[in-house]
From Swiss-Prot:
The gene is ccmE. It comes from Vibrio vulnificus (strain YJ016). This is Cytochrome c-type biogenesis protein CcmE. GO terms for biological process: cytochrome complex assembly. The lineage of its organism: Bacteria, Pseudomonadati, Pseudomonadota, Gammaproteobacteria, Vibrionales. The chain crosses the membrane at residues 9-29. Heme chaperone required for the biogenesis of c-type cytochromes. Transiently binds heme delivered by CcmC and transfers the heme to apo-cytochromes in a process facilitated by CcmF and CcmH.
């Protein structure tokens, strides 16, 4: 093999090794950051295909905060509450300031780590609201600046052409 061909082969091998390493690192990073979504029933009973998360696995869980289940530690920001859908309850432990929309009976999504079969240690809690929600400040500002539209009879009838 002449030196020119040997140099080309070395460059091609280096490029292939570099691309393979890059793809491998990207797949590893995506697997580390992938959080699977569960409902409380799926967390306890498993998904339809029978898969259940392992203790220590990162996940997202969504459901309704059970009425009367919120327990706050008076000496810290620790909060424990139960989350349920139509089946079993799951306990969420969170340390931090809860969102303004958080309340009992409200839908939330918590992101965290599975501590045991029915307990999730959350590091983020998101309160859910419907698409018609508008913060009070914005609603008030819109009332001041946007007058209701007045339509003529012709506009209400539409152009009959």
């Amino acid at each position: 093999m002449n030196p020119r061909r040997q140099k080309r082969l070395g460059i091609i091998l280096a490029i292939l090794i570099g691309v393979s390493a890059t793809i491998g690192l990207m797949i590893y990073a995506l697997n580390q950051n992938m959080d699977l979504f569960y409902t409380p029933t799926e967390l306890v009973n498993g998904k339809d295909d029978g898969t259940k998360p392992e203790v220590g696995q990162r996940l997202r869980i969504g459901g309704m905060v059970v009425m009367g289940s919120v327990r706050r530690d008076p000496e810290s920001l620790k909060v424990r509450f139960d989350l349920a859908d139509v089946g079993p309850k799951v306990t969420i432990e969170y340390e931090g300031i809860l969102p303004d929309l958080f309340r009992e009976g409200q839908g939330i999504v918590a992101q965290g780590v599975l501590k045991d079969a029915t307990t999730v240690e959350a590091f983020e809690v998101l309160a859910k609201h419907d698409e018609e929600y508008m913060p009070p400040e914005i609603a008030e500002a819109m009332k001041k600046t946007h007058a209701p539209l007045q339509y003529s009879e012709e506009q209400k009838q539409g152009s009959g052409q």
